Amino acid sequence: MYKRQDYSIPTPDGTDLDLKQYEGKVIMIVNTATGCGFTPQYEDLEQIYHDCHDKGLEIIDIPCNQFKGQTPGTDEEIHEFCTLKYHTEFPQMRKSDVNGEHALDLYTYLKGQRPFEGFGRGAKAFAMSVMLKRIDRNYKSNPDIKWNFTKFVIDRAGNVVARFEPTADMKDVRDCVEGLL
């Protein structure tokens, strides 16, 4: 179990979002991109947020440009894109790294709690596996975030209970969240 007060996330206005303020809530943390094949997941994320926020869910959007540069633009441009195209209302943080030496401390912790377990089955999972093998033949053996729209779900007690790869069915993500509320 982590202590929420141990982690903060930089916001676009230069302040930090202290996770302690979400004590007792279910949190979904997701690294996002505006120019990715998975970007339409914003629609599902916003629907989950709309349906579950009043029951105790928070979604934290962390834009990331580490995967083929699919999050170009400033924080302001990213925010404008998300709010105009997908009507997102959940908090969006400053564009940040999720892997490597500049990764947010929170992501280092999350990956340690829920390492990569595969993309599942289906055409998207197969395509992701083929692509990543070209980049790193040993991609399966490290806990790093593999692509945009990887989601971590944290229960009300602060336990990291799930990691969903971008290929996961959003119904499974919703079911997990609703089961914790």
Which functions belong to the PLM regions below?
Residues 1-2:
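Short, small-residue-biased leader/transition segments that mark boundaries at the very start
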Residues 7-26, 47-52:
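A short beta-strand-turn-helix
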Residues 25-26, 34-63, 82-86:
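Conserved helix-turn-beta segment immediately C-terminal to the redox Cys motif
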Residues 56-73, 89-100:
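Thiol-based oxidoreductase modules, predominantly thioredoxin-like and allied folds used
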Residues 81, 87-167:
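Thiol/selenol-based redox catalytic cores and closely related redox-interacting motifs
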Residues 161-181:
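Non-catalytic, surface beta->alpha helical segment in thiol-disulfide oxidoreductase systems
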